[in-house]
Amino acid sequence: MGQKVNPLGIRLNITRTWDSVWYADKDYSTFLIEDQKIRKFLKKRLSHAGLSSVKIERTGEQVRIKLFTARPGIVIGKKGAEIEILKRELEKLVSRKVTLDIQEVRRPEADAQLVADNIAQQLARRVAFRRAMKKAVSSALRFGVQGIKIACSGRLGGAEMSRCEWVREGRVPLHTLRADVDYALSESHTTYGIIGVKVWIFKGEVLSDKDKGAVAQ
Protein backbone atom coordinates (compact mmCIF):
# COMPACT_ATOMS: atom_id res chain seq x y z
CA MET A 1 0.00 0.00 0.00
CA GLY A 2 2.77 2.43 0.93
CA GLN A 3 4.37 1.88 -2.47
CA LYS A 4 1.21 2.89 -4.36
CA VAL A 5 -0.42 5.81 -2.54
CA ASN A 6 0.81 9.39 -2.29
CA PRO A 7 3.36 9.41 0.59
CA LEU A 8 2.13 12.82 1.78
CA GLY A 9 -1.58 11.99 1.85
CA ILE A 10 -1.16 8.75 3.81
CA ARG A 11 0.90 10.61 6.47
CA LEU A 12 -1.56 13.47 7.06
CA ASN A 13 -1.94 14.20 10.77
CA ILE A 14 0.99 11.83 11.52
CA THR A 15 4.14 13.54 10.25
CA ARG A 16 2.63 16.48 8.34
CA THR A 17 -0.43 18.76 8.25
CA TRP A 18 -2.77 19.98 5.51
CA ASP A 19 -1.63 22.61 2.98
CA SER A 20 -5.02 24.35 3.20
CA VAL A 21 -6.30 25.17 6.71
CA TRP A 22 -9.90 26.44 6.74
CA TYR A 23 -13.46 25.30 7.37
CA ALA A 24 -16.37 25.98 5.03
CA ASP A 25 -19.90 24.68 4.73
CA LYS A 26 -21.71 25.89 1.60
CA ASP A 27 -18.65 27.78 0.26
CA TYR A 28 -16.40 24.70 0.24
CA SER A 29 -16.27 24.31 -3.56
CA THR A 30 -15.66 28.06 -4.06
CA PHE A 31 -12.73 28.08 -1.63
CA LEU A 32 -11.28 24.89 -3.12
CA ILE A 33 -11.28 26.36 -6.65
CA GLU A 34 -9.77 29.59 -5.27
CA ASP A 35 -6.95 27.61 -3.62
CA GLN A 36 -6.21 25.84 -6.91
CA LYS A 37 -6.15 29.19 -8.75
CA ILE A 38 -3.77 30.68 -6.16
CA ARG A 39 -1.36 27.73 -6.33
CA LYS A 40 -1.39 27.62 -10.14
CA PHE A 41 -0.80 31.38 -10.35
CA LEU A 42 2.05 31.36 -7.80
CA LYS A 43 3.77 28.37 -9.43
CA LYS A 44 3.85 30.20 -12.76
CA ARG A 45 4.60 33.66 -11.31
CA LEU A 46 7.43 32.50 -9.01
CA SER A 47 8.94 29.78 -11.21
CA HIS A 48 12.35 31.52 -10.98
CA ALA A 49 12.24 31.97 -7.19
CA GLY A 50 12.52 28.31 -6.09
CA LEU A 51 8.98 27.92 -4.71
CA SER A 52 8.70 24.82 -2.53
CA SER A 53 5.15 24.89 -1.11
CA VAL A 54 2.16 27.16 -0.52
CA LYS A 55 0.10 27.03 2.70
CA ILE A 56 -3.29 28.76 2.71
CA GLU A 57 -5.28 29.81 5.80
CA ARG A 58 -8.66 31.57 5.79
CA THR A 59 -10.33 33.63 8.53
CA GLY A 60 -13.52 35.41 7.52
CA GLU A 61 -12.87 37.36 4.32
CA GLN A 62 -9.09 37.33 4.77
CA VAL A 63 -6.70 34.89 3.08
CA ARG A 64 -3.28 34.29 4.62
CA ILE A 65 -0.74 32.71 2.26
CA LYS A 66 2.58 31.26 3.44
CA LEU A 67 5.21 30.91 0.73
CA PHE A 68 8.16 28.58 1.33
CA THR A 69 10.89 29.58 -1.10
CA ALA A 70 14.63 29.05 -1.56
CA ARG A 71 15.11 32.66 -2.75
CA PRO A 72 13.04 35.00 -0.55
CA GLY A 73 14.96 38.05 -1.80
CA ILE A 74 13.54 37.60 -5.31
CA VAL A 75 9.97 37.30 -3.97
CA ILE A 76 10.25 40.33 -1.65
CA GLY A 77 12.20 42.54 -4.08
CA LYS A 78 13.99 45.82 -3.40
CA LYS A 79 12.41 47.53 -0.35
CA GLY A 80 9.47 45.10 -0.58
CA ALA A 81 8.36 46.35 -4.01
CA GLU A 82 7.85 42.91 -5.58
CA ILE A 83 5.83 41.50 -2.68
CA GLU A 84 3.43 44.46 -2.83
CA ILE A 85 2.85 43.89 -6.56
CA LEU A 86 2.31 40.16 -5.91
CA LYS A 87 -0.15 40.94 -3.09
CA ARG A 88 -2.22 43.23 -5.33
CA GLU A 89 -2.28 40.60 -8.11
CA LEU A 90 -3.52 37.93 -5.67
CA GLU A 91 -6.21 40.24 -4.23
CA LYS A 92 -7.43 40.91 -7.76
CA LEU A 93 -7.45 37.15 -8.47
CA VAL A 94 -9.55 36.11 -5.44
CA SER A 95 -11.35 39.42 -4.65
CA ARG A 96 -10.40 39.16 -0.97
CA LYS A 97 -7.86 40.74 1.38
CA VAL A 98 -4.57 38.81 1.14
CA THR A 99 -1.72 38.61 3.67
CA LEU A 100 1.62 37.18 2.52
CA ASP A 101 4.17 35.47 4.77
CA ILE A 102 7.52 34.55 3.19
CA GLN A 103 9.49 31.65 4.74
CA GLU A 104 12.98 30.68 3.60
CA VAL A 105 13.84 27.06 2.77
CA ARG A 106 17.32 26.81 4.30
CA ARG A 107 18.26 23.45 2.75
CA PRO A 108 16.89 23.42 -0.82
CA GLU A 109 19.00 20.32 -1.64
CA ALA A 110 16.92 18.36 0.92
CA ASP A 111 13.52 19.64 -0.27
CA ALA A 112 11.73 17.19 -2.59
CA GLN A 113 9.85 19.81 -4.63
CA LEU A 114 12.93 21.94 -5.24
CA VAL A 115 15.01 18.87 -6.17
CA ALA A 116 12.33 17.68 -8.62
CA ASP A 117 11.97 21.14 -10.21
CA ASN A 118 15.75 21.45 -10.53
CA ILE A 119 16.04 18.09 -12.33
CA ALA A 120 13.11 19.00 -14.61
CA GLN A 121 14.82 22.28 -15.57
CA GLN A 122 18.07 20.42 -16.33
CA LEU A 123 16.24 17.90 -18.54
CA ALA A 124 14.63 20.79 -20.45
CA ARG A 125 18.17 22.11 -21.07
CA ARG A 126 19.13 18.67 -22.50
CA VAL A 127 21.35 17.62 -19.59
CA ALA A 128 21.75 13.81 -19.44
CA PHE A 129 19.09 12.43 -17.08
CA ARG A 130 21.46 10.05 -15.26
CA ARG A 131 23.92 12.88 -14.56
CA ALA A 132 21.11 15.13 -13.26
CA MET A 133 19.76 12.38 -10.97
CA LYS A 134 23.16 11.37 -9.56
CA LYS A 135 24.11 15.00 -8.90
CA ALA A 136 20.84 15.57 -6.99
CA VAL A 137 21.35 12.38 -4.94
CA SER A 138 24.91 13.29 -3.91
CA SER A 139 23.86 16.87 -2.99
CA ALA A 140 20.95 15.63 -0.83
CA LEU A 141 23.11 13.07 1.02
CA ARG A 142 25.67 15.79 1.77
CA PHE A 143 22.94 17.75 3.55
CA GLY A 144 22.15 14.92 5.96
CA VAL A 145 19.08 13.17 4.51
CA GLN A 146 18.86 9.47 5.39
CA GLY A 147 17.66 8.32 1.99
CA ILE A 148 16.57 9.56 -1.43
CA LYS A 149 14.89 8.01 -4.46
CA ILE A 150 14.46 9.72 -7.85
CA ALA A 151 12.47 8.36 -10.80
CA CYS A 152 12.32 9.83 -14.32
CA SER A 153 9.81 8.52 -16.86
CA GLY A 154 9.14 9.42 -20.48
CA ARG A 155 11.15 9.54 -23.70
CA LEU A 156 14.49 9.75 -21.89
CA GLY A 157 17.32 10.98 -24.08
CA GLY A 158 14.91 11.29 -27.02
CA ALA A 159 14.37 7.51 -27.24
CA GLU A 160 11.57 6.20 -29.46
CA MET A 161 10.00 4.21 -26.63
CA SER A 162 9.27 5.78 -23.24
CA ARG A 163 10.62 4.09 -20.12
CA CYS A 164 11.22 4.69 -16.42
CA GLU A 165 14.68 4.97 -14.85
CA TRP A 166 15.30 5.40 -11.14
CA VAL A 167 18.12 5.70 -8.64
CA ARG A 168 18.07 5.25 -4.85
CA GLU A 169 20.58 5.81 -2.06
CA GLY A 170 20.01 5.10 1.64
CA ARG A 171 16.63 4.10 3.14
CA VAL A 172 13.23 5.25 1.87
CA PRO A 173 10.68 3.33 4.05
CA LEU A 174 7.32 4.09 2.40
CA HIS A 175 5.35 1.59 4.56
CA THR A 176 6.50 3.13 7.87
CA LEU A 177 3.97 5.86 8.67
CA ARG A 178 6.15 7.52 11.32
CA ALA A 179 8.88 7.99 8.68
CA ASP A 180 9.17 11.63 7.60
CA VAL A 181 9.11 11.15 3.81
CA ASP A 182 8.97 14.23 1.60
CA TYR A 183 7.56 13.62 -1.90
CA ALA A 184 7.19 15.76 -5.01
CA LEU A 185 6.32 15.48 -8.69
CA SER A 186 7.52 17.80 -11.45
CA GLU A 187 7.25 17.80 -15.24
CA SER A 188 9.90 18.68 -17.81
CA HIS A 189 8.57 19.90 -21.17
CA THR A 190 11.11 18.79 -23.78
CA THR A 191 11.01 18.69 -27.59
CA TYR A 192 10.33 14.92 -27.35
CA GLY A 193 7.39 15.31 -24.97
CA ILE A 194 6.83 15.53 -21.22
CA ILE A 195 9.22 13.77 -18.82
CA GLY A 196 7.87 13.14 -15.32
CA VAL A 197 10.23 13.51 -12.34
CA LYS A 198 9.33 12.02 -8.94
CA VAL A 199 11.43 12.52 -5.80
CA TRP A 200 11.15 10.80 -2.39
CA ILE A 201 13.37 12.06 0.47
CA PHE A 202 13.54 10.28 3.85
CA LYS A 203 14.54 12.73 6.61
CA GLY A 204 14.23 10.47 9.65
CA GLU A 205 11.53 9.04 11.92
CA VAL A 206 9.11 11.21 13.89
CA LEU A 207 8.63 9.66 17.33
CA SER A 208 5.82 10.44 19.80
CA ASP A 209 6.63 11.37 23.43
CA LYS A 210 5.76 7.78 24.47
CA ASP A 211 8.12 6.30 21.86
CA LYS A 212 10.90 8.74 22.81
CA GLY A 213 10.64 7.59 26.44
CA ALA A 214 10.87 3.94 25.38
CA VAL A 215 13.96 4.65 23.25
CA ALA A 216 15.62 6.56 26.13
CA GLN A 217 15.11 3.59 28.49
UniProtKB/Swiss-Prot annotation:
Residues 38-106 form the KH type-2 domain. GO terms for molecular function: mRNA binding; rRNA binding; structural constituent of ribosome. The keyword RNA-binding applies. Disulfide bonds: none annotated. This is Small ribosomal subunit protein uS3. CDD domains: KH-II_30S_S3. HAMAP family: Ribosomal_uS3_B. One of its GO terms (cellular component) is cytosolic small ribosomal subunit. It comes from the Bacteria. InterPro entries: KH_dom, KH_dom-like_a/b, KH_dom_type_2, KH_sf_prok-type, Ribosomal_S3_C_sf, Ribosomal_uS3_bac-typ, Ribosomal_uS3_C, Ribosomal_uS3_CS. Keywords: Ribonucleoprotein, Ribosomal protein, RNA-binding, rRNA-binding. One of its GO terms (biological process) is translation. Part of the 30S ribosomal subunit. Forms a tight complex with proteins S10 and S14. The keyword Ribonucleoprotein applies. Belongs to the universal ribosomal protein uS3 family.
